[in-house]
Design a protein with these regions (language model features):
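Terminal low-complexity/charged segments
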Residues: 1-143
Length: 143
C-alpha cells in the first residue's frame, strides 16, 4: 500500500481513501514503521449538504514515534450512510462512532455496540444533519 502524503512541518495533508479500503488503510498506517500512526485522536463528521449528497469523515491520527499528525478522509453517501468501523484497529474509535451515528445517522458497520449516546431514547432524526427539522416535541422536565 502506498500513500502519497505531502509532509508539512509536523503533519501530513489530508488524504482521501475509498470506504472499502478504510480498515486496511488504518491497519497499514498503524503498523507500518514508516508512518506508525498509533493513536486515533478523533473522528470528525461533516455534512457536505444536500446538493453533494455526501458526508465526510475525517480521521485524525497521531504518531507517538515521530510526533506527526495525519488525516484520513472518506466520503459517505447520504442515501446509504454506511462505513466500516475502525474499532478493531483503534479501540478509541468506539465513542466517536457512536456519537456520529447519534448526530448524523452514519452507520459504522461491525461496530460491536453501535447506539445513541447523547439523544434521549426514542429521539427521531439526526440533529447535526443540514436537513434536520426540529419538531416542537420538547423534553418535559420533571419538577
Amino acid at each position: 500500500m502506498n500513500f502519497d502524503m505531502i509532509k508539512k512541518e509536523n503533519s501530513f495533508d489530508k488524504i482521501l481513501i475509498e470506504n472499502d479500503k478504510l480498515v486496511e488503510s488504518m491497519n497499514f498506517l498503524k503498523n507500518n514503521a514508516e508512518y506508525y500512526f498509533d493513536r486515533l485522536n478523533t473522528i470528525i463528521a461533516v455534512d457536505l449538504g444536500l446538493e453533494s449528497g455526501k458526508f465526510e469523515l475525517i480521521y485524525d491520527l497521531y504518531s507517538t514515534n515521530t510526533g506527526l499528525n495525519g488525516r484520513i478522509s472518506v466520503l459517505v453517501e447520504r442515501n446509504s450512510p454506511h462505513v466500516p468501523s475502525v474499532v478493531e484497529v483503534f479501540k478509541s474509535a468506539y465513542f466517536d462512532e457512536c456519537e456520529i451515528y447519534d448526530m448524523f445517522g452514519i452507520v459504522f458497520d461491525k461496530n460491536p455496540n453501535l447506539k445513541r449516546l447523547l439523544m434521549p431514547k426514542g429521539w427521531e432524526g439526526y440533529p447535526l444533519r443540514k436537513d434536520y427539522e426540529q419538531n416542537d416535541n420538547r423534553l418535559k422536565w420533571n419538577k
